């Protein structure tokens, strides 16, 4: 399929645009690697229901109810009410639940409860997702308040200072326990002198029954067993066609972890995965990121299957091989620097399938594992996902965004000339170096920053990248074409952090998501601290607000200063300073500027959030059932894919 004729956009609704991505190079892989990718992609798809359930305990039944309506309703499918229901279902698919994937607020249906009740009652009972012994009426009585009452489960993850974050979050990680009880439960498990602590609570739901607090572990024979068993069956097939012994061991340890739920085994798996840098095909499958837990402990299920982009990997390897130089020259207090940077193995990858918390909305860079001690002893693995970045860039060409928000032609030309390069490079620096830099002082709890941990960690990685982009070392290593290139990233970062990312927030709301908080924190802090010298200004022209950078070199010094402070906060576990920074700069929104940005954005008819449909892999078999080839196709639509996944991979 030729690049120019490839259609990157699928459809657009609500605040979402659905794209598709190409998997260049798949057709040319040898059969064994195609088989490996196919088996791993099946293992990825089998876990879909886990995330729906983690995001809220009624999500699966609500999704299935709406799907039943969407498939079987025989009445007027052209009415406004039906259209509203269709959009709502598409949003639920996208968010893996009834709360916004990014802002975490519950969706407000544009159809009425009377309409849904009428439609549901028109369906034959056998197509409804009734639980054992449940009547249609009982199901509606249970689910309708969850869908329609704004006071019921309003937020998936609540980060509001001073509230019980566990009781006020709708995510399904805790049942019947308060924040205090949850924190006490895990504090009692932690040993102060443990040099190799497991990630407590990572793979379980914490429940209180009859005054007894205990964990329901996600494993074979435990919670989510039926989905995990399916995942294992495909992983076993993958093990048979693994590229080498190291990869075989990775898969074996992962299967063992899924069977036992033993977190020591998860650490062993993480270390083995980290050390396998030779395999072309790689994958993540499991409970990984903790953004969905207000306490930052419990990990959502995700999977990605990928293979190395050899050409682009040269860039990240250059950065990684110089990691010690960057650590030594960072503007951070020597007490907080790593004396010896453990190799961050870095590569650019081509995604072959996305699943769980990486689907449809996904990351463009990943740095794992998340265990602090493993990172400091064994290093980490960092990836930039080349074909997804490429799809975003191709889909956004000529959409009018820069013309509307960028201050002048000078900045527009900077962005036109350098943005694709500096954007990728900032992601690489963030993932390869940023997360891997610095160290905690002895005895500091990695969870000391509590609810602000994610924001501070993302800011630390972003600042590391921002600080180094203008460095002469970048030109010396051949990573940027000239000394002007970094200005493109500085401009787009400040414009985004101060203004344009606000398009992702509803009027009257505050900034909640960790990555958005980090970007606003950095941009607002720099704006304020450079005020006296007019380093960066918000200027008004023809009634519109723009960001203008007057002194790029001084802006770099400000980034360095903030990096030093944020590293100190992380290294010392200074919760109060973290809270101050976040509450002062990262959370509040100027309502007047917000309204203006939303108005200007609306006129462009763009969607602030983007996600992907996956390609479809079809195995070709001989008479004996052996796979002889795997074909890839890109023609599946959004609803078509979601309904197929619900039909073929509904395991809970």
Q: What annotation goes with each model-predicted range?
A:
Residues 2-71:
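N-terminal-proximal low-complexity accessory segments that begin disordered
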Residues 22, 51, 466-569:
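Long, well-structured alpha-helical subdomains associated
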Residues 30, 244, 454-471:
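An active-site-proximal "capping" alpha-helix that borders the catalytic cofactor pocket
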Residues 87, 94-413, 419:
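Contiguous, non-catalytic segments that form substrate-binding/exosite surfaces or channel walls
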Residues 245-251, 266-268, 444-447, 474-491, ...:
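Short, glycine/acidic-rich hinge or "gate" loops at secondary-structure transitions
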Residues 420-433:
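Short alpha-helix carrying the canonical HExxH Zn2+-binding catalytic motif
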Residues 438-459:
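Post-HEXXH active-site segment of zinc metalloproteases
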Residues 551, 555-652:
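Extended, compositionally biased alpha-helical segments that mediate assembly or anchoring
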């Amino acid at each position: 399929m030729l690049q120019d004729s490839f259609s990157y956009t699928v459809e657009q609704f609500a605040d979402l645009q659905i794209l598709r991505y190409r998997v260049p190079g798949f057709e040319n892989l040898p059969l064994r690697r195609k088989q490996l990718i196919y088996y791993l992609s099946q293992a990825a798809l089998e876990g879909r229901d886990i995330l729906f359930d983690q995001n809220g305990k009624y999500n699966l039944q609500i999704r299935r109810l709406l799907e039943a309506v969407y498939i079987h309703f025989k009445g007027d499918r052209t009415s406004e009410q039906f259209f509203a229901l269709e959009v709502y279902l598409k949003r639920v698919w996208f968010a893996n639940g009834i709360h916004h994937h990014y802002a975490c607020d519950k969706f407000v249906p544009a159809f009425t409860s009377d309409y849904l009740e009428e439609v549901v009652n028109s369906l034959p009972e056998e197509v409804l997702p009734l639980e054992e012994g449940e009547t249609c009426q009982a199901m509606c009585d249970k689910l309708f308040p969850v869908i329609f009452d704004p006071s019921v489960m309003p937020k998936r993850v609540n980060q509001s200072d001073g509230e019980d974050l566990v009781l006020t979050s709708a995510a399904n990680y805790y049942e019947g326990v308060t924040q205090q009880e949850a924190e006490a439960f895990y504090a009692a498990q932690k040993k102060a002198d443990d040099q190799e602590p497991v990630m407590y609570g990572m793979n379980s739901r914490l429940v209180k029954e009859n005054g007894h607090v205990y964990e329901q572990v996600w494993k074979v024979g435990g919670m989510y067993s039926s989905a995990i068993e399916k995942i294992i069956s495909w992983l076993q097939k993958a093990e048979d066609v693994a590229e080498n012994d190291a990869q075989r061991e990775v898969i074996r340890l992962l299967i063992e972890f899924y069977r036992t739920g033993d977190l020591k085994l998860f650490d062993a798996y993480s270390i083995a995965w980290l050390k396998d840098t030779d395999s072309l095909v790689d994958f993540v499958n499991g409970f990984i990121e903790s953004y969905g837990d207000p306490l930052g402990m419990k990990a959502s299920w995700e999977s990605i299957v990928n293979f190395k982009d050899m050409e682009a990997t040269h860039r990240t390897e250059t950065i990684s091989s110089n990691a010690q130089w960057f650590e030594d020259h960072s503007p951070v207090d020597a007490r907080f620097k790593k004396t010896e940077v453990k190799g961050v193995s870095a590569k650019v990858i081509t995604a072959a399938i996305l699943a769980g918390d990486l689907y449809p909305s996904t990351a463009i860079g990943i740095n794992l594992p998340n265990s602090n001690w493993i990172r400091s002893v064994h290093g980490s693995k960092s990836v930039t996902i080349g074909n997804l970045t490429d799809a975003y860039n191709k889909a956004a060409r000529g959409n009018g965004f820069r013309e509307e928000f960028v201050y002048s032609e000078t900045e527009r030309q900077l962005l036109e000339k350098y943005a694709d390069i500096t954007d990728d490079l900032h992601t690489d620096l963030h993932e390869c170096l940023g997360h891997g830099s610095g160290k905690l002082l002895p005895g500091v709890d990695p969870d000391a920053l509590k609810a602000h941990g994610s924001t501070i960690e993302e800011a630390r990685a972003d600042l590391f990248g921002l600080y180094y982009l203008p460095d002469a070392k970048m030109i010396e290593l051949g990573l940027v074409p000239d000394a002007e290139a970094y200005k493109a990233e500085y401009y787009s970062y400040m414009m985004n952090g101060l203004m344009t990312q606000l398009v992702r927030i509803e009027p009257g709301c505050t900034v909640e998501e960790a990555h958005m908080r980090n970007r606003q924190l950095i941009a607002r802090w720099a704006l304020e601290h450079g005020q006296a010298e007019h380093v960066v200004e918000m200027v008004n022209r023809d009634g519109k607000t723009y960001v203008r950078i007057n002194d790029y070199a001084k802006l770099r010094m400000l980034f360095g200063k903030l990096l030093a402070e944020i590293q100190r906060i992380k290294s010392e576990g200074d919760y109060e300073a973290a809270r101050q920074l976040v509450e002062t700069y990262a959370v509040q929104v100027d309502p007047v500027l917000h309204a203006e940005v939303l108005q200007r954005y609306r006129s462009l008819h763009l969607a602030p959030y983007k996600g992907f449909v996956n390609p479809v892999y079809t195995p070709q078999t001989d008479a004996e059932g052996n796979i002889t080839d795997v074909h890839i196709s890109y023609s599946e639509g959004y609803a078509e894919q979601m309904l197929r996944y619900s039909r073929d991979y509904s395991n809970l």
